[in-house]
């Protein structure tokens, strides 16, 4: 583990050095930067119906794109869906998953169904140095995630693996705010969801509380159609704190709520359910542009890895341990999170 951590840390330094040596623009001439051409992956259970509306010049935001990041090429296993998307948003359809090489500046996978095959879909782009956005939960197992992270490090290819909640102001300011409340006693949170993959709160709270989660538990009646859901992150004792639990549940009506209870006060955050798509998703797209324009990592590779280990452990708890806490280190690296839609690909798509 320490060797892998050092490898990933070195990769981050390499990317940072590359940016420093090849700065594409200063703040003063940022407006002169050409819009990045974005390759579109996945149009079924996908963010792209929302993202395109914000990014395309044909979107609803005053008839213009909101960022210098525009969808220009699209691939989907369903050719009709790809052509319908292209007609609506002014894109070019490619006939193979690797057909956007040499045509786009970045690729963004918006499709949940793609996740177990994401390491295959994105491999050509990672090897070619094309920045890639990974769809959550980022992989089906740790072995496949490590394949992508290793390629990112080897080829100095920026990757980003986040959920919208990680880009909200509460996530950005929370770590500083909790420094003023003394030793943490307990953490509670809720999020309005219909299925487990949309339960983004754990990643937001890890950004606030830290990534040194030791054990995870998950209880739910159904990951596909949630009636009840509870996920617990167990933080061990450390030099400057007592052990505590971050307990998160599915609940309405707010998009999310959380409270961190300390010895000397509390820190809370919330987003109302009425928040529109701009409020919910613009931060993600802005940070994608900011990171990929500069060819930097939004988060260190070992943070991406730890986030996946936490969700993998949550599923392992639910399906192998009846919801009991599971030490992250005890989950086999090749233990798979089941595909959202089994047999979404038959394998023929990945052969020349």
What are these regions (language model features)?
Residues 15-20, 24-88, 165, 179:
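N-terminal Rossmann-like dinucleotide-binding module
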Residues 78, 89-149:
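Beta-loop-alpha module in the N-terminal Rossmann-like domain of NAD(P)-dependent dehydrogenases
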Residues 225-288:
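C-terminal substrate-binding/catalytic lobe of Rossmann-fold NAD(P)-dependent oxidoreductases
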Residues 75, 185-253, 302-309:
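Rossmann-like dinucleotide-binding domain that binds NAD(P)(H)
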Residues 138-201:
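A contiguous active-site-proximal alpha/beta segment in oxidoreductase catalytic domains
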Residues 72, 105, 185:
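Conserved acidic residues
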């Amino acid at each position: 583990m320490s060797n892998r951590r050092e490898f990933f840390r070195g990769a981050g330094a390499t990317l940072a050095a590359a940016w420093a040596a090849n700065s594409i623009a200063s703040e003063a001439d940022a407006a002169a930067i050409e819009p990045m051409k974005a390759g579109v992956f996945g149009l079924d259970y996908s963010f792209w119906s929302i993202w395109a509306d914000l990014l395309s010049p044909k979107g609803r935001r005053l008839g213009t794109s909101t960022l210098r990041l525009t969808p220009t090429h699209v691939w989907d296993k369903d050719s009709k869906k790809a052509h319908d998307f292209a007609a609506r948003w002014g894109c070019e359809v490619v006939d193979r998953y690797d057909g956007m090489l040499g045509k786009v500046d970045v690729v963004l996978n918006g499709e949940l169904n793609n996740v177990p095959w994401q390491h295959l879909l994105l491999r050509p782009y990672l090897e070619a140095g094309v920045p890639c956005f990974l769809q959550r939960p980022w992989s089906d197992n740790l072995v496949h995630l490590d394949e992508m992270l290793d390629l990112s490090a080897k080829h100095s290819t920026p990757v980003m693996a986040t959920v919208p909640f990680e880009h909200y102001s509460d996530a950005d300011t929370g770590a500083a705010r909790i420094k003023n409340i003394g030793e943490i006693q307990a953490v509670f949170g809720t999020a309005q969801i219909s299925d487990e993959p949309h339960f983004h709160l754990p990643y937001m709270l890890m950004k606030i509380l830290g990534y040194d989660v030791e054990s995870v538990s998950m209880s739910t009646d159904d990951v596909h159609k949630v009636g009840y859901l509870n996920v617990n992150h167990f933080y061990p004792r450390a030099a400057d704190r007592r052990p505590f639990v971050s307990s998160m549940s599915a609940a309405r009506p707010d998009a999310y709520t959380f409270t961190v209870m300390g010895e000397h006060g509390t820190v809370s955050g919330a987003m109302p359910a009425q928040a529109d798509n701009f409020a919910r998703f613009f931060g993600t797209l802005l940070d994608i542009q900011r990171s990929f324009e500069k060819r930097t990592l939004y988060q260190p590779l070992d943070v991406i890895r730890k986030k996946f280990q936490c969700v993998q452990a949550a599923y392992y708890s639910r399906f192998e341990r009846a919801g009991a806490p599971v030490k992250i280190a005890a989950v086999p690296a090749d233990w798979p999170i089941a595909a959202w839609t089994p047999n979404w690909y038959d394998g023929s798509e990945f052969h020349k």
